[in-house]
């Protein structure tokens, strides 16, 4: 099948080009993070709620790659809970046009499996670590697995990863005071520490009002202490990344409530049930699964994605308290 011409690069009516696909492969997670799945994973009960198969994943990734996508992040839920996770990595990594294959994981299985992930073609890893205090880690995640996750990060370096990104969801009265400890941790480690503002979702209004804290205070602190903003490349995410000559690590800030946050949007999302989401906080998903049954449906699939892109909003509406249809972040992979 012919690749898309340059004119068919996935692009919306605001001339934003989409180089980055966030592909969820499961909604299931074995952690119970307060800001995501505080009561743990509960199946939807829908008969038709099986997650994307490996052939379906291959087809959707190929369509995106043929239209200019060069980076795929495999998300969940917890993607490593899929028994075929390594096969998924290999399938994505061997798709012509895909240059970066990343995953976001809770790190629970990393110590045992990360060598296999790397061999399969995983180029980048993000691990969620919301506290360096084992007791607070347990309180936030619902699991007493701090040591296992830390061992997983060290193992990633041992098998050859030059950098690991660590995601920290900022929460007032829980972990927002831990900046000095985190800075000390990354001083001699090539970790990009990413502080993510707590985001409002449909089921988390109370948590948001109680624990939301802006990343602006951290940014001001970093700048005052000699940290410098890095230039962003076209396939990077929305993080403002800061570097310091005395630190091996970096700091990223993800602040969705910041003005013009959506201006540099370069990613699209496909859920584990095969729906296209134009925005993490959009009103609805677009069914793609009926066009993932056969290889010869690719042109139709591309046309559907391209036409839906023309309906993508210029911005989310979080400032109006409109969180869209996202009940929790596990539902479409954050």
Swiss-Prot record:
It is an enzyme of class 4 (lyase). [4Fe-4S] cluster 1 binds at residues 29, 33, 36. Belongs to the radical SAM superfamily. MoaA family. This is GTP 3',8-cyclase. One of its GO terms (biological process) is Mo-molybdopterin cofactor biosynthetic process. GO terms for molecular function: 4 iron, 4 sulfur cluster binding; cyclic pyranopterin monophosphate synthase activity; GTP 3',8'-cyclase activity; GTP binding; metal ion binding; S-adenosyl-L-methionine binding. It catalyses: GTP + AH2 + S-adenosyl-L-methionine = (8S)-3',8-cyclo-7,8-dihydroguanosine 5'-triphosphate + 5'-deoxyadenosine + L-methionine + A + H(+). Its cofactor is [4Fe-4S] cluster. It comes from the Bacteria. Catalyzes the cyclization of GTP to (8S)-3',8-cyclo-7,8-dihydroguanosine 5'-triphosphate. Pathway: Cofactor biosynthesis; molybdopterin biosynthesis. InterPro entries: Aldolase_TIM, Elp3/MiaA/NifB-like_rSAM, MoaA, MoaA_twitch, MoCo_biosynth_MoaA/MoaC, rSAM. S-adenosyl-L-methionine binds at residues 35, 77, 128, 199. [4Fe-4S] cluster 2 binds at residues 262, 265, 279. Pfam families: Fer4_12 (PF13353), Mob_synth_C (PF06463), Radical_SAM (PF04055). SMART domains: Elp3. The gene is moaA. Monomer and homodimer. Residues 13-239 form the Radical SAM core domain. Keywords: 4Fe-4S, GTP-binding, Iron, Iron-sulfur, Lyase, Metal-binding, Molybdenum cofactor biosynthesis, Nucleotide-binding, S-adenosyl-L-methionine. It comes from Vibrio parahaemolyticus serotype O3:K6 (strain RIMD 2210633). The keyword Metal-binding applies.
